Structure formats: C-alpha cells, structure tokens
C-alpha cells in the first residue's frame, strides 16, 4: 500500500541538467548504463562496509549482486541491486536536488556550456550521473528500501521539471532491500544514437566495454534455444541467469595486458568522471608492506578542487575487498585531485578513520604513493611538456599547497612547480630555469606577489628591476603569499620579495663610487624625511630614500621579516588575529614631486596644505600596489581639492 504521495519540483540546477539530457547534447548515450551500474556497485560497497561496522544491522550479504532486466514488449530496462538502499529523505536529497557545494558554479557552467564536450564534463564534475538515464528514457522509476528499514520509497519522473515521490508500506514485504531503477526507453533512433537497449547483445557489449571490472557480479536472465530434435518435436526455450562481467581487478593485471580504453573506463568508474585521464600510474610494492595501486591524474580539475574538505578520490581495498572510498589518509591534501585504487595485502580490517590515521602501514603507503605521483609529474615536465602544461593549468595552484605542508618533498615540489615571470608573457618558468638565466652579480631570486599579472607589472616595486634587466617571478595565487614565507631558498639562492626589506641592485664597484653621493643626498632630504615621518605617523613607521624606484614618486614596503598586507588580510579572513603593522614609505629622490615637496617644505614649513599633499602621496603609493585606502572619502576630498586648484590656476 502506498501513502504520503508528493509531487515536487526539481531544484533549478537539476532542471537545467535534465534539459541538457532530454535535448541530447551528449555524444555517447550508451554511457547511461555505466552510470547506473556504477551507482549500484557503490551501493553494494556501502552495504558491505556498513554491515562490517554495524553488527546490529541484520542483513544478508552472502549474495550481493547487480541485476539487469529487460522487457522487450514494454520497452523497459531495469538495473537492480541489493545494496544499502535509500530513505525517502535521501532520495529527495540525492536525486530531486543537488545537495552539494558548488551549485552556484554549476548553474554558471550550465549557462556557459556551448557544446556537448563541455556539457559532458559537468556530469562527472558534479557527481550526478543518475541524470544520464534521461538521455535514453522518457520516464524513469526508482524503487528503494534502505537496509534495516521497513519503509520503501518510490520515485518517478518524466524529466519535465517535477517528480513524484511516495512511501510504500512494507507490511507485505513486497519491496526487497536495495534499489531498482526502471527506464521506459525512448524509441530506437540510429541517427540520434539511440540503440535497442532491450537487446541482450547490446547489454553484453556495454557491460563488457564499461563495467567488466566491477567487483560485483552483474547478472541478466537470457533465453537459450535448443533446436528441435531430428526425430521430431519442438524447439525448446530455457531461461538462464548469466554473469556478464569478469570481475577481474584491473589493478592486479600487468600493465601491458590492459588497454588504454580499459584504463579510461576504469578511471571514469572510480572517479565518477567523464573526461579521460591525463596520466595512468600503476605500481606494485612488495616486501614489508605489500600493496598494488592504480592511480590516475585527471585531465580536468573538479569544481571543488580548492575545497580542502572535498572528498579525496582514492579507494582502499584489502585483499580485493572494498574497505573505504575517499580514503584521505592515502594521499596528502595537496594531491586530492588524484583518483584511483589502493589494494593492500595485509591490514587490520577493524578500521575506522581514526585508527587509520595511526596505522604505520597506511603512513608508509601514503609516503610511497606521494613520491610516485610527484615523480610522474616530474617525468611529464621533462618528457611530456604538453601534458605537463595541461596538468599545471588545471592543478598547479593546489600542488603549491604542498610547499607549505610537505617538508619531506619540498625540494621536489620546488623543482616541479612553474611560475609566471617577467621573462615571458606566455610561458611560465621553473626555478631551475630562472637560476640558469641569472646574470653575473645577481645572487637572489626576486619575486613579486599580488592579485594579477597586470597589477604586478605596473607596480612601482618592479621599476629598478626592469631598469637593470633582472627577471622577477610574478606570483598571483593566494597560496603564494603563504609559501614564500616558509621557503627561504632554492639551489642555494635566497628568495627575495621586491616589496620587502632594502634592495641594493648595484655591484660592489658601483657602491664604492656612490657611497659619498648617497650620503650627500640623504642629508639633503633629511628635513623632509623627518617631517613626513611625523605627518604620516598614523600610517608609516619609517620614511627613507628608495633604491628601487625609477618612475614613481613613492612606494610602500614591508620589513624583511614583516607580514605583507595581503597575507594579513588572508589571516584575518580565516579568523586569525593579526596586529596592524605600519609599513615603510620609500621616496624617489629624482622625482619632481618629491624634489618639489622638499622645496615647498623648506619655504613654507608644515602648513595644512602640505600635510594634505603628504597624505595624497601616501594614498597614491598605497593604490599603486593595489592596496585599500583606510579613508577613501578623505582621500577623494583631498584629491578633488587639488584638482579644483589645478583647474582654477589655468582660468
């Protein structure tokens, strides 16, 4: 008996996805079966794990399997499992809506999806392969019962913006544990690549192509016809249940026996992805800790790449028995984009996430996997540069997080990272390449950190470096502000910010001849510097002449060991208290504004108008580096007053 029937609307993002499906933007409609079988396999994995963890769960796990049923007359295809099942709330959460972070980004990407290849990537990125059913079906029914629960749930939709959901009374026990998905198939249409999905041979073909490696048996009832005997009688028809997949663990097979297509399909299964892997990493370890691993570096970044709490895509097996999906103890957070499987031969099965964190074998496996992934990236960098460029574009920002957290592999990470620089507008550089290009006399690796390349190229801090022809790394990712504080050198060359500390780009010979000139210049500006330090005491802790400016009148810098404003903002945004730190104002002694200000101060003293000019000087220096004014209204007022006087002087 059914009760509690509701008709609900799909969430906006879900409606957009359905529209993509129904209007056939996908090039390969056959992949719907892979998605349904993959979901069924996940449900069986979850039930096996839950029965292991929860001894009070009274379920039979002796014959876990997936069934495929077809009805040629009704033109239906059903994929059924006896796995974990779902409650009514879980059905609404997982199917009626997209209960995931990043739905706003999904909405934007759906709007921007102009072609089928772009659209195809969205399914895998947002983990919503169930919707692929609507590529081949006019109507989809789902019937499910959660393991250990008495109530079952029926869900149905034709993909037109609404769905119905009802609770099914289990008094008669008519709904078995698990989930069945029934597709009411669209008419066969070869031009639209809609095949006959009730055909036994088509189902066999798709299971072999997409799901042969699934660890659970995929069964289907098939008819077997026996010809009539020669001495008379009729042809006999029997129905047999066949297992369609080999269930061979792909990671246990030698690499030369596995085709690229098999690796690709396995990657799509474990990663719930639609793109192809950029790199395949197969490894086998023997000795103290025996394990096999099959890892993949994707070719596209997932939407939640920069969410450090996002699920890690490495599954843990022990002796080919699924133990845990998204095992974050197997891969450091900065490699969270890596997908795949690790199969250990000897590990305690009494596992929990807390125990795993303390497991010596898990730590050893993680260390080896990390080194293997980094060595693969290094090989890409040196031997397959096109692949490396793709990798760096997609995952470079997150890989740099390892410079902060993985001290053991920091040197390797420094060598594998790439950075924009003033050397080339298009091609990034490695630190090793930067060092090779350093001219005689340069002993430091110079870098500038900011929000964008354009902002940094116009920063006053770069002026002297441009004049000297020194290359400067342009660091524009938020993580750059953090890792440069903990990495002090590369290949014996110190890293030096162009916006911190004192900069002296002259050679020793030049310095010997310029010391007297410099002292004389400092004496000539001593009064102005002392007055500006007092007038701007609320903003700066020191005023001095600059050796880094050639065109701008002034700039702001931070002490050698001080915290930059951008880093301070990041810390405050994360809730960490950071004291306000005054900075240093450097003046360009050759700029007409500075020499004019010196003469005006000599003749007029510290009048109110000059104080306003000093504030404008500080404000323009702050704006030139992309900073934020403390009192924009006052700055605007002072500027308007100066502009008014300029116009008035010319009338």
From Swiss-Prot:
Gene behind this protein: htpG
Which InterPro entries did the record assign? HATPase_C_sf, HSP90_C, Hsp90_fam, Hsp90_N, Ribosomal_Su5_D2-typ_SF
Q: Does the keyword Coiled coil apply?
A: no
| MF term (GO), any | ATP-dependent protein folding chaperone
Q: Give the location in the cell.
A: Cytoplasm
| Keyword Chaperone listed | yes
UniProt region (A), positions on chain: 1-353
Q: How does it assemble?
A: Homodimer.
Return the protein name: Chaperone protein HtpG
């Amino acid at each position: 008996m059914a009760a509690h029937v509701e008709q609900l609307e799909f969430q906006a993002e879900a409606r957009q996805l359905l529209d993509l499906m129904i209007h056939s933007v996908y090039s390969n409609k056959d992949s719907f079966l892979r998605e349904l079988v993959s979901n069924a396999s996940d449900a069986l994995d979850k039930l096996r794990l839950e029965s292991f963890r929860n001894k009070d769960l009274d379920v039979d796990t002796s014959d876990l399997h997936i069934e495929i049923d077809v009805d040629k007359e009704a033109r239906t295809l059903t994929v059924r499992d006896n796995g974990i099942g779902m409650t009514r709330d879980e059905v609404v959460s997982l199917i009626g809506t997209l209960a995931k972070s990043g739905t706003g980004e999904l909405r934007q990407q759906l709007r921007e999806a102009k072609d089928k290849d772009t659209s195809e990537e969205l399914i895998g990125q947002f983990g919503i392969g169930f919707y692929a059913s609507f590529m081949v079906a006019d109507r989809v029914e789902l019937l499910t019962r959660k393991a250990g629960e008495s109530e079952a749930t029926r869900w149905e939709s034709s993909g037109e913006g609404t769905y119905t959901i009802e609770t099914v009374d289990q008094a008669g026990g008519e709904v078995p544990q698990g989930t069945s998905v029934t597709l009411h198939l669209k008419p066969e249409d070869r031009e639209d690549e809609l095949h006959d999905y009730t055909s036994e041979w088509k189902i066999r073909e798709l299971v072999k192509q997409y799901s042969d490696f699934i660890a659970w048996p995929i069964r289907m009832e098939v008819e077997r016809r026996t010809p009539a005997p020669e001495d008379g009688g009729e042809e006999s028809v029997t129905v047999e249940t066949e297992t369609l997949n080999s269930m061979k663990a792909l990671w246990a097979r030698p690499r030369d026996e596995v085709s690229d297509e098999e690796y690709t399909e396995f990657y799509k299964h474990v990663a719930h992805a639609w793109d192809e892997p950029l790199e395949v990493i197969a490894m086998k370890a023997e000795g103290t800790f025996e394990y096999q691993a099959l890892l993949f570096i994707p070719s596209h970044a997932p939407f939640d790449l920069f969410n450090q709490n996002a699920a890690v895509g490495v599954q843990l097996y022990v002796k080919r028995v699924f133990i845990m999906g998204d095992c974050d103890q197997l891969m450091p957070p900065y490699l969270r984009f890596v997908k795949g499987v690790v199969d250990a031969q000897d590990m305690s099965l009494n596992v929990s996430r807390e125990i795993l964190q303390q497991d010596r074998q898990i730590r050893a496996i993680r260390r080896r996997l990390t080194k293997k992934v980094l060595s693969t990236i290094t090989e890409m960098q040196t031997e397959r540069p096109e692949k490396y460029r793709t990798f760096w574009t997609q995952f470079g920002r997150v890989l740099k997080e390892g410079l902060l957290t993985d001290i053991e592999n920091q040197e390797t990470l420094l060598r594998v990272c790439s950075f924009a620089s003033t050397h080339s507008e298009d091609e990034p550089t490695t630190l090793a390449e930067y060092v090779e290009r350093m001219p005689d006399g340069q002993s430091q690796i110079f870098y500038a950190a900011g929000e964008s390349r354009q902002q940094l190229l116009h920063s006053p801090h770069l002026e002297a470096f441009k004049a000297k022809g020194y290359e400067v790394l342009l660091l524009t990712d938020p993580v750059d502000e953090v890792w440069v504080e903990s990495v002090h050198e590369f290949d014996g060359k110190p890293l030096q910010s162009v916006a911190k500390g004192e900069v002296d780009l002259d050679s020793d010979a030049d310095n010997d001849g310029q010391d007297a000139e410099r002292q004389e210049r400092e004496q000539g500006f001593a009064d102005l510097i002392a007055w500006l330090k007092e007038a701007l005491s609320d903003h700066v802790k020191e005023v001095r002449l600059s050796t880094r400016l050639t065109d701008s009148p002034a700039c702001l810098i931070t002490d050698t060991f001080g915290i930059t404003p951008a880093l301070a903002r990041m810390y405050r945004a994360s809730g960490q208290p950071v004291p306000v730190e005054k900075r240093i104002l450097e003046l360009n002694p050759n700029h007409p504004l500075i020499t004019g200000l010196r003469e005006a101060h000599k003749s007029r003293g510290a009048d109110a108008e000059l104080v306003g000019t000093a504030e404008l000087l500080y404000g323009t220096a702050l704006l030139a580096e992309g900073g934020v004014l403390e009192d924009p209204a006052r700055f605007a007022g002072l500027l308007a007053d100066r502009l008014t006087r300029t116009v008035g002087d010319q009338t």
